[in-house]
Amino acid sequence: MVEYTNTFKVAAVQAQPVWFDAAKTVDKTVSIIAEAARNGCELVAFPEVFIPGYPYHIWVDSPLAGMAKFAVRYHENSLTMDSPHVQRLLDAARDHNIAVVVGISERDGGSLYMTQLVIDADGQLVARRRKLKPTHVERSVYGEGNGSDISVYDMPFARLGALNCWEHFQTLTKYAMYSMHEQVHVASWPGMSLYQPEVPAFGVDAQLTATRMYALEGQTFVVCTTQVVTPEAHEFFCDNDEQRKLIGRGGGFARIIGPDGRDLATPLAEDEEGILYADIDLSAITLAKQAADPVGHYSRPDVLSLNFNQRHTTPVNTAISTIHATHTLVPQSGALDGVRELNGADEQRALPSTHSDETDRATASI
């Protein structure tokens, strides 16, 4: 049963990473986690791929030039799920008794993913969800998620969900999230300063509109967290004035938004680092849903509905003959999650996965 009576405090981070340095950015992340906990928060949220930072170089140079300069370093500083860096994040959540949603560049074998880690206050990994479809030139760096990455998680304080960046432009993805009665949503973004003012769709106003609309459409609280572009970013990514103009400056728009669309905390300047704090009262959701509940009384499923495949999929299913096999297949460290081992014609056993059984559901119709 979904409850709407809890009250608690949340934190939204607006900050830049230590560019493409996983260890130092984890240090900064742990420090921010501690600060949010000292201020009485039950949840702190971090930007998209905060560790080790958003790859702005893909937007300001040719793919070949960007790869030559940054690809190896970015790959090396992306996090594997069994890395000491991830363990430090889990430990920080446990030590400070606070839930954490943090964006990382996840390395799985040779591929990278735009991942959000959902960690509870006991330091347990609740979810590792990947961006379903990286945006535009992001697809030259990152792979895709799957249906199991669209989910909402029961936390002690609320039903919690998270999406990255332009996933907030994906109408069907949003509707699937709303259908799971999400109460608090983490919207993780990079700093949106690219190509301004020539391309308004990439600017702060457009992204903030999408973020605020998420709160209004879903009648949910939104904790919006962003990176910022500072002179340090220019120094790191840019070789000339033209590239500095393309990346721009600032781009921060962290917010904490209520289900009626109002800001619950005073925003920072677009180029300022800091943490926003706000108190959440879930009963405000019930007031908003009295007017419009798009997955309840304000829906018409007989006219419009969504097919939602939440199954976790993998590119390889391995069959092993029990008659002719001379050794047992053992999944190697870092192997694909959910690769299946088939012993005989009728037996199928899933290898260990970070996903729960719940995320392996068959296609659902909403």
Curated annotation (Swiss-Prot):
Its EC number is 3.5.5.7. Gene3D superfamilies: Carbon-nitrogen hydrolase (3.60.110.10). Residues 8-282 form the CN hydrolase domain. SUPFAM superfamilies: Carbon-nitrogen hydrolase. It catalyses: an aliphatic nitrile + 2 H2O = a carboxylate + NH4(+). One of its GO terms (molecular function) is aliphatic nitrilase activity. Changing C165 to S/A: 100% loss of activity. It is an enzyme of class 3 (hydrolase). InterPro entries: C-N_Hydrolase (IPR003010), C-N_Hydrolase_sf (IPR036526), Nitrilase/CN_hydratase_CS (IPR000132), Nitrilases_CHs (IPR044149). Residues 355-366 have a biased composition (Basic and acidic residues). Keywords: Hydrolase. The active site is at E48 (proton acceptor), K131 (proton donor), C165 (nucleophile). Residues 346-366 are annotated as: Disordered. Transmembrane segments: none annotated. Homodimer. Belongs to the carbon-nitrogen hydrolase superfamily. Nitrilase family. This is Aliphatic nitrilase. It comes from Rhodococcus rhodochrous. The gene is nitA.
